[in-house]
Regions:
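Polytopic alpha-helical membrane-helix bundles and their juxtamembrane interface segments
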Residues: 1-146
Length: 146
Protein backbone atom coordinates (compact mmCIF):
# COMPACT_ATOMS: atom_id res chain seq x y z
CA UNK A 1 0.00 0.00 0.00
CA UNK A 2 1.35 3.41 -0.94
CA UNK A 3 1.73 5.87 1.97
CA UNK A 4 0.81 3.34 4.67
CA UNK A 5 1.77 5.93 7.31
CA UNK A 6 -1.37 7.83 6.33
CA UNK A 7 -3.75 4.86 6.42
CA UNK A 8 -5.65 6.00 9.52
CA UNK A 9 -6.03 9.53 8.13
CA UNK A 10 -7.31 8.07 4.86
CA UNK A 11 -9.78 5.96 6.82
CA UNK A 12 -11.13 9.12 8.46
CA UNK A 13 -11.65 10.76 5.06
CA UNK A 14 -13.35 7.65 3.70
CA UNK A 15 -15.57 7.60 6.79
CA UNK A 16 -16.67 11.13 5.84
CA UNK A 17 -17.48 9.85 2.34
CA UNK A 18 -19.58 7.04 3.84
CA UNK A 19 -21.53 9.63 5.84
CA UNK A 20 -22.24 11.48 2.58
CA UNK A 21 -23.43 8.30 0.88
CA UNK A 22 -25.65 7.40 3.85
CA UNK A 23 -27.22 10.86 3.74
CA UNK A 24 -27.80 10.57 -0.01
CA UNK A 25 -29.33 7.07 0.20
CA UNK A 26 -31.81 8.08 2.94
CA UNK A 27 -33.55 5.78 5.41
CA UNK A 28 -36.64 4.83 3.40
CA UNK A 29 -37.43 2.05 2.89
CA UNK A 30 -35.90 0.85 6.14
CA UNK A 31 -35.51 -2.93 5.51
CA UNK A 32 -33.73 -3.69 8.81
CA UNK A 33 -32.89 -7.32 7.95
CA UNK A 34 -30.45 -6.12 5.29
CA UNK A 35 -28.72 -3.98 7.92
CA UNK A 36 -28.66 -6.82 10.43
CA UNK A 37 -27.18 -9.21 7.85
CA UNK A 38 -24.41 -6.77 6.92
CA UNK A 39 -23.71 -6.08 10.61
CA UNK A 40 -23.32 -9.80 11.34
CA UNK A 41 -20.97 -10.34 8.39
CA UNK A 42 -18.82 -7.31 9.26
CA UNK A 43 -18.72 -8.20 12.97
CA UNK A 44 -17.57 -11.74 12.21
CA UNK A 45 -14.94 -10.55 9.72
CA UNK A 46 -13.62 -7.96 12.16
CA UNK A 47 -13.57 -10.20 15.22
CA UNK A 48 -12.18 -13.31 13.50
CA UNK A 49 -9.88 -11.98 10.78
CA UNK A 50 -8.92 -8.36 11.29
CA UNK A 51 -8.78 -7.20 14.92
CA UNK A 52 -6.84 -10.18 16.35
CA UNK A 53 -4.02 -9.35 13.94
CA UNK A 54 -3.87 -5.57 14.46
CA UNK A 55 -1.66 -4.17 17.21
CA UNK A 56 -1.96 -0.44 16.45
CA UNK A 57 -4.42 1.13 18.92
CA UNK A 58 -5.70 3.70 16.41
CA UNK A 59 -6.50 0.99 13.89
CA UNK A 60 -8.10 -1.21 16.56
CA UNK A 61 -10.56 1.66 17.12
CA UNK A 62 -10.66 2.82 13.51
CA UNK A 63 -11.59 -0.46 11.84
CA UNK A 64 -14.78 -1.07 13.88
CA UNK A 65 -15.85 2.58 13.68
CA UNK A 66 -15.29 2.75 9.94
CA UNK A 67 -17.06 -0.61 9.51
CA UNK A 68 -20.19 0.75 11.17
CA UNK A 69 -20.41 3.54 8.60
CA UNK A 70 -19.38 1.32 5.68
CA UNK A 71 -21.99 -1.25 6.65
CA UNK A 72 -24.65 1.42 7.06
CA UNK A 73 -23.86 2.76 3.59
CA UNK A 74 -24.21 -0.75 2.16
CA UNK A 75 -27.48 -1.30 4.01
CA UNK A 76 -28.98 1.97 2.78
CA UNK A 77 -27.95 1.33 -0.84
CA UNK A 78 -29.20 -2.27 -0.83
CA UNK A 79 -32.50 -1.30 0.82
CA UNK A 80 -33.37 0.84 -2.23
CA UNK A 81 -32.62 -1.74 -4.93
CA UNK A 82 -36.27 -2.45 -5.71
CA UNK A 83 -36.89 1.18 -6.74
CA UNK A 84 -35.39 0.95 -10.25
CA UNK A 85 -32.39 0.08 -12.41
CA UNK A 86 -30.20 2.93 -11.14
CA UNK A 87 -30.85 1.82 -7.56
CA UNK A 88 -29.91 -1.77 -8.47
CA UNK A 89 -26.63 -0.54 -9.95
CA UNK A 90 -26.04 1.65 -6.89
CA UNK A 91 -26.62 -1.38 -4.65
CA UNK A 92 -24.11 -3.35 -6.70
CA UNK A 93 -21.68 -0.44 -6.30
CA UNK A 94 -22.14 -0.55 -2.53
CA UNK A 95 -21.41 -4.30 -2.50
CA UNK A 96 -18.26 -3.69 -4.55
CA UNK A 97 -17.23 -0.97 -2.07
CA UNK A 98 -17.68 -3.50 0.76
CA UNK A 99 -15.59 -6.03 -1.19
CA UNK A 100 -12.87 -3.46 -1.90
CA UNK A 101 -12.59 -2.33 1.71
CA UNK A 102 -12.87 -5.90 2.95
CA UNK A 103 -9.91 -6.83 0.77
CA UNK A 104 -7.93 -3.94 2.25
CA UNK A 105 -8.57 -5.20 5.78
CA UNK A 106 -7.86 -8.83 4.95
CA UNK A 107 -4.71 -7.90 3.03
CA UNK A 108 -3.45 -5.73 5.91
CA UNK A 109 -4.19 -8.01 8.80
CA UNK A 110 -4.94 -11.58 7.82
CA UNK A 111 -3.64 -12.79 4.47
CA UNK A 112 -1.60 -11.14 1.73
CA UNK A 113 -3.91 -11.39 -1.25
CA UNK A 114 -2.28 -12.07 -4.60
CA UNK A 115 -2.83 -9.08 -6.90
CA UNK A 116 -4.34 -7.19 -3.96
CA UNK A 117 -3.79 -3.73 -5.43
CA UNK A 118 -5.53 -4.69 -8.68
CA UNK A 119 -8.47 -6.28 -6.87
CA UNK A 120 -8.87 -3.39 -4.43
CA UNK A 121 -8.61 -0.62 -7.00
CA UNK A 122 -10.74 -2.25 -9.71
CA UNK A 123 -13.60 -2.99 -7.30
CA UNK A 124 -13.25 0.49 -5.78
CA UNK A 125 -13.39 2.36 -9.11
CA UNK A 126 -16.29 0.28 -10.40
CA UNK A 127 -18.09 0.85 -7.08
CA UNK A 128 -17.61 4.60 -7.36
CA UNK A 129 -18.86 4.60 -10.95
CA UNK A 130 -22.01 2.66 -10.04
CA UNK A 131 -22.72 4.77 -6.95
CA UNK A 132 -22.24 7.96 -9.00
CA UNK A 133 -25.08 6.87 -11.28
CA UNK A 134 -27.52 7.61 -8.45
CA UNK A 135 -26.39 11.24 -8.51
CA UNK A 136 -26.96 11.36 -12.27
CA UNK A 137 -30.56 10.25 -11.69
CA UNK A 138 -31.09 13.09 -9.21
CA UNK A 139 -29.67 15.61 -11.69
CA UNK A 140 -31.95 14.24 -14.42
CA UNK A 141 -34.99 14.54 -12.13
CA UNK A 142 -34.05 18.14 -11.32
CA UNK A 143 -33.83 19.01 -15.04
CA UNK A 144 -37.29 17.51 -15.65
CA UNK A 145 -38.70 19.50 -12.76
CA UNK A 146 -37.45 22.80 -14.20
Amino acid sequence: MVYSDFFLLGMIFFLAAQVSFIKAFLFEPLKPMIGVSIAIILTLALSLLILPNISDFGLKLGFPLYSIFLGTMGWRALARMDQGMIEKLTGLGAVLFLVSDGCIGINMAYYKLPRAQEIIMSTYYLAQFLITLSACKVIDQEKKRL
